[in-house]
Design a protein with these regions (language model features):
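Extended, loop-rich substrate-binding clefts of extracytoplasmic carbohydrate-active enzymes
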Residues: 1-45, 75, 169-170
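Hydrophobic beta-strand positions in extracellular immunoglobulin-like domains
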Residues: 53-54
Length: 173
């Protein structure tokens, strides 16, 4: 974070090296950074491992934080409640907290504008369940004082009309 085009909008160069799919963004002309995303299968449990790196290709010192966004449709998103923090806020319709978990069901499509939930999460994970499939994102658990400015450790964005949800997590800033 901050969000640069090379993270989420520019095309990536793809290559396969042994058992790793490597995607490399072109240098972003505005930010001066390039992003590499590596995907592999864990030999331990067959989960998909993702490793991101951000390279500063400019001559200026940068202060950045990793950011990951996963877009999903339908279902139910959830994560364990983290520390109390001033950034914890939400205007997401239908989201609620119960038994130490935050639950966000996919909306019915009546929301006219985007909605956003900002929070901390305990244990470094968030998940989404839809039609018999469970997707779990695991990431380093960070303290509230390590979160990028005006962001949450985890965030859920609900697109207008409930077209999709974004499950977002930030790393140490």
């Amino acid at each position: 974070w901050p969000q640069y085009q090379c993270v989420d909008e520019l095309p990536y160069q793809a290559e396969i090296d042994k058992q790793i799919l490597r995607l490399v963004s072109p240098p972003d002309s505005i930010s001066g950074v390039s992003v590499t995303k590596e995907f592999s299968i864990s030999e331990r449990d067959s989960s998909i491992l993702i490793h991101y790196s951000v390279r500063n290709v400019s001559r200026q010192l940068k202060r950045l934080a990793p950011w990951d966004v996963t877009r999903v449709y339908g279902g139910l998103s959830f994560f364990p409640v983290g520390e109390t923090d001033r950034m914890n806020k939400s205007d997401v319709t239908g989201g609620y907290e119960d038994k130490g978990m935050v639950w966000v069901p996919c909306p019915d499509g009546t929301n006219e504008r985007g909605q956003k939930l900002f929070s901390t999460a305990y244990g470094g994970w968030m998940a989404h369940y839809y039609r018999g499939l469970l997707f779990v994102k695991c990431f380093p658990d960070i303290r509230p004082d390590e979160v990028p400015p005006r962001q949450g450790e985890v965030e859920i964005f609900v697109a207008p009309k409930g077209r999709y949800l974004e499950l977002e997590n930030h790393g140490k800033y």
